[in-house]
Amino acid sequence: TLRERVAELVGTEVAIDVVAADAVRGRVTGAGADWLGIESAAGLRAAVVPLAAVASVAAAESDLLRSARPSGRRPALAERMTLGFVLRDFARRRVGVRIAVAGNATWTGTIDRAGADHLDLALHGAGEHRRTSAVTGHRMIAYPALQTVHLDGGNG
C-alpha cells in the first residue's frame, strides 16, 4: 500500500505532490494510519499530509526501490495513529497551524477541537497566540478536504 511504502521512506528526502495544494518537500519523519509527517525544507517546522491528499511521491530511485521491498518490521505505534489522533494532539498543545484545503484555500490559526471527521479552527495570524482579541473567525473543516497541515514555528 502507499502507507506501507511511505513508512519505508522515513528519514528520506522526498517531494510530495498534493492533489489540490502546493507540493511539500522535505524529509519523511513518520507515517501513521492515514497520514505522513514531513520535516519541511521550506523552513516550517513540520507538515502533516493526509494520505488521501497525496497525488505522487518523488524520491531517489534507490529509495523508491527500497520502499517496494517490505522490511518485515512490525508496525510502530505511530503507524497505527490516525489523522484525527494527531490533530487532537495539536489541539491539546494549542499549536498554531497553516491548513491548506481542496479549492486552494489556506487558513492560519489554532485547532480548537478535532473530531472523528472534522476539526474546528480558530482563525488568527501566523505566529500569533490564540487569544480572543486575535481570533478573526472560526472554521469547521472536514478531513476529506485537508491537503496539508503545517505547524507554525512562531507560537508552538
For each of these PLM feature ranges, what is it?
Residues T1-R25, T29-T108, D112-H118, A122-G156:
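Short glycine-rich, low-complexity segments
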